[in-house]
Structures are given as structure tokens and as C-alpha cells.
Amino acid sequence: MNSKILFSYTIIIIGTVMILLGARWMLVDEPWMLDEVANVERLEMTFEELFNSESNKTLPGYLKQIYRFFGYWVITIGLFIISFSTPKLIESNDLRKRLLLCLGFMMLLGTILGHALIPSSHFIYLVWIMNASYLFCIFQHNKINK
């Protein structure tokens, strides 16, 4: 298959994954439970214990609000990724380089923060799959340039 198509579709898949993750955080009633094990480990208490305190009665609503905004931004990033990775647009070498630079920065920092802050999260596995996809894109980019 054509390297440009492989590059483009792989980036589109990364963007689609971002959109799906963002939608999950926006639509789930208790989004903090999507990664319960890592969150409980980080908090060093259960959510039940956290929410039982009188001073934390409004915390679930606040967390829901924060996760909704987070989901919105993840969806927006996914849409940008998809918008700039169509086969026609990625014919531009400069655009491919900028897309790879931005994605690389996002993936590197996401991997570092994930391992540092929530190492037991199941999202770590997804990050590594996305990193492998990103490396595949770099390989395809290099093939296009030859």
C-alpha cells in the first residue's frame, strides 16, 4: 500500500481514538471511575471515603465538570489531528513534519505523565499502542521522503 495512505490512515486512527476517549469522559456519569484503580491508588482512599466527607459533598459535580471539559479538549485535539491528516493534505512534507512534531510532543509528555502519575492505569497500554502507531507514521514519513 502507498506510504502516504498508510501515514494518513494511521494518523486518522490516532485522532479517532482521541475522539472516542474524549467522548467517553464526556458521556459517562462518573468519569473518574473509568480509571478507578489508578485513581484510588493515587488518592490513597476510595471515592466513597472521599465523597462521604461533608466538605466534599459537591466534589462529584465538580469532578464531572472537569472531566467534561477534559473530554471536550481531547475530542477537539482528535478533530484537529484528523483534519490535518487527510491523504491530500499530508502530501505536504512541511505539514507532515509539523503534525509529527505536535503528535510526538503530545505522545511523549502523555507517556511520561502517565507513567509518573498513574502507572497502574489501563490507559498506559493504550498510550503504548498509540506510540507504536506514531513510530509507524515516522517510518512511513521517511519512506515518502525517499
Ranges and model annotations:
Residues 6-38:
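N-terminal signal-anchor transmembrane alpha helix
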